[in-house]
A protein has these predicted regions:
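Electrostatic cytochrome c docking/interface patches
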Residues: 1-10, 24-27, 79-109, 188
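The canonical Cys-X-X-Cys-His
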Residues: 13-20, 73, 77, 101, ...
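Gly/Gly-Pro-rich "capping" loops immediately C-terminal to redox-active cysteine motifs
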Residues: 3-6, 14, 18-50, 59-64, ...
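N-terminal alpha-helical segment
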Residues: 9, 22-24, 54-55, 97, ...
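Generic structural signal for alpha-helix termini and adjacent loop/cap motifs
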Residues: 19, 48-49, 79-83, 107-108, ...
């Protein structure tokens, strides 16, 4: 149980995801600037027990959140500026993995549709992925692939992730983590 006295509703989430929505720990995804529709659907999936691929940690936390505050929490994180990263590939990034990930994300390959078909600003249900923690992305793709992440809308991702090799999952994760930034749904 979390002692919520004196806390704004979003501060409960900020304990792991950071007050600025840019978690410094790769286990916790960056929420700043994420699409509000996506954030709300994930909170509801955790709350209603439809998403369990984190060992139940989020379900137990989200059930402590007053349902009347969910829209405010979502609005807070969606309205924060997304992470800013240099559009130049950072030193130390595996260039081969980066380029392979870029090609998969932007062009796809035989049998696998390009990621950016859905993961772009025009598709409200698909999350923004650029600048997200590579380890988090890798885990989510593997959870889809091995059917550990099952929730509303997961069927499409499961079928796509099953087509990816471990090297491709790694490459996509490296590319997205290192490939830039995005703006939030709210103008700054």
């Amino acid at each position: 149980m979390i002692d919520k006295d004196g806390m704004a509703p979003w501060e409960i989430c900020g304990m792991c995801h950071s007050a600025d929505g840019i978690s410094r720990m790769s286990k916790f995804p960056i929420l700043a600037g994420q699409k509000a529709t996506y954030l709300k659907s994930q909170m509801l999936d955790f709350r209603q027990g439809r998403r369990l691929n984190d060992g139940g940690q989020m379900s137990s936390i989200v059930t402590e959140v007053d349902p009347a505050t969910i829209d405010g929490i979502v609005g807070y994180f969606a309205g924060l500026p997304g992470p800013l990263m240099n559009l130049v590939v950072q030193p130390g990034v595996d260039q081969v993995a980066y380029e392979a990930g870029r090609l998969l994300f932007e062009e796809g390959r035989s049998g696998a549709v390009a990621c950016n078909v859905c993961h772009n600003d025009g598709h409200p249900a698909a999350p923004r992925l650029r600048a997200q923690h590579a380890a988090y992305l890798r885990k989510q793709l593997n959870d889809f692939k091995y059917e550990r992440r099952v929730s509303e809308g997961a069927t499409v991702m499961t079928s796509i992730a099953k087509l990816l090799t471990e090297n491709e999952i790694d490459s996509i994760s490296v590319y997205l983590h290192s490939s830039g930034s995005y703006d939030s749904d709210v103008a700054h």
